[in-house]
Amino acid sequence: MSQSLIVALDFPGKQDVEQFLRHFEGEELFVKVGMELFYKEGPAIITYLKEKGHKIFLDLKLHDIPNTVKSAMRSLASLDVDMVNVHAAGGNSMMKAAIEGLEEGKQEGKERPICIAVTQLTSTSEAMMKKEIGIEKTLEEAVAHYAKLTKESGLDGVVCSTLEVPKLREVCGDGFVTVTPGIRLASDDVNDQVRVATPKRARELGSSYIVVGRSITKAENPLEAYKTVKQQWEGVTV
């Protein structure tokens, strides 16, 4: 189950990544590369991480017209990443185009990357969604609507908070992938995320993958923090 624990490499550049990964010699991680790191280092950071044996969730949250997203996904698939994402708000045609691009760009003999859609960011509260984004549904209703649209479009799952996982299991079935950021150890600050949970709670609620950043990357001993998160996520008593 450790391969369903994704470590967010929220660093400004490769040097910081190299320093962090020194704590994990011999470990094969599933890591998340976001906008900050990818926009600074480009595809070279993907090559570097792949050479180290790590799986990669390339978290760029694409949201554009269908043809642009299709072309972008064709390029991303050629990098041999393991997971990519789009914004569900881009709609059915855009999400279908994303899958078409991934199929066209995947490396020969390999499966296309897992493709998931962002429903609502974990920094979004219901009040913000209604007042600023203009969606009058409850947060749970909005997330469920986007999840159904995502499944109908042929994607593998969604990014959502742990709080929405049980509802999405009802709406989309057990095979639908739920990737949940906003994971913190009980002793950590929540920082800028609103809908957060512990690894243990994420497991209880049925998350497929959890994404953990600062609880590991900012820890005094990142490897020990990783092991603690992993134990809680896997339900191991020590």
UniProtKB/Swiss-Prot annotation:
A single GO cellular-component term on record: cytosol
Keyword Protein biosynthesis included in the entry's annotation: no
Catalytic activity reported: orotidine 5'-phosphate + H(+) = UMP + CO2
One GO BP: 'de novo' pyrimidine nucleobase biosynthetic process
InterPro entries (alphabetical): Aldolase_TIM, OMPdecase, OMPdecase_AS, OMPdecase_bac, OMPdeCOase_dom, RibuloseP-bd_barrel
Family: Belongs to the OMP decarboxylase family. Type 1 subfamily.
Role played: Catalyzes the decarboxylation of orotidine 5'-monophosphate (OMP) to uridine 5'-monophosphate (UMP).
Entry protein name: Orotidine 5'-phosphate decarboxylase
Organism (species): Bacillus cereus (strain Q1)
Lineage: Bacteria, Bacillati, Bacillota, Bacilli, Bacillales
